[in-house]
């Protein structure tokens, strides 16, 4: 069994936008633009996380939109070379913990 890649899960900031926008282009056929990501970062009902590798590069990211007591995962993306390391699972676990702590009806 191979050793899993070490990542830190932190809130996404403006400093991560270029790497996240690049990740969008790599992973999705209709990616969110950098401007769309900026707008979502400013949305009080949205939360975005990034998984940073040991060199503080974005290995993955995920987004959550909360409407009333409902949580909606907007996007989950992991760099192709970083996949199969449990990164998406770690990102989603933070959102699951948030949903439970804030008594969301569903996620």
Go through the PLM ranges and name each one.
Residues 2-3, 11-83, 89-104:
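Acetyl-CoA-dependent GNAT
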